[in-house]
UniProtKB/Swiss-Prot annotation:
One of its GO terms (biological process) is L-tryptophan biosynthetic process. Transmembrane segments: none annotated. The lineage of its organism: Bacteria, Bacillati, Bacillota, Bacilli, Bacillales. It comes from the Bacteria. This is Indole-3-glycerol phosphate synthase.
C-alpha cells in the first residue's frame, strides 16, 4: 500500500516540474490585470496610519482612496 502511495505521489510531482528549458511564457502585467475572464484585477492595501509615521490620512475614506 505504501509503495502505491509513493508511486502516485511521484507521478503527481512530475506533473509539477518546470518546463525543460525552465522558462515560462511572459505575460503583460497590465493585460493580466485587465483580463475580462478574471473577477479580481488587483489587490491593494490602503492605510490610514503607519506604525512608524502615525496618521497618514486624517480624513480617511478607504473606498475613495482605493478608487483614486
Amino acid at each position: 500500500m505504501l509503495n502505491q502511495i509513493i508511486a502516485r505521489k511521484k507521478e503527481h510531482i512530475q506533473t509539477l516540474q518546470l518546463p525543460v528549458d525552465g522558462h515560462f511564457e511572459r505575460r503583460s502585467f497590465k493585460e493580466a490585470l485587465m483580463n475580462p475572464h478574471r473577477s479580481i484585477g488587483l489587490i491593494a492595501e490602503v492605510k490610514k496610519a503607519s506604525p512608524s509615521k502615525g496618521i497618514i490620512q486624517p480624513n480617511f475614506d478607504p473606498l475613495q482612496t482605493a478608487k483614486a
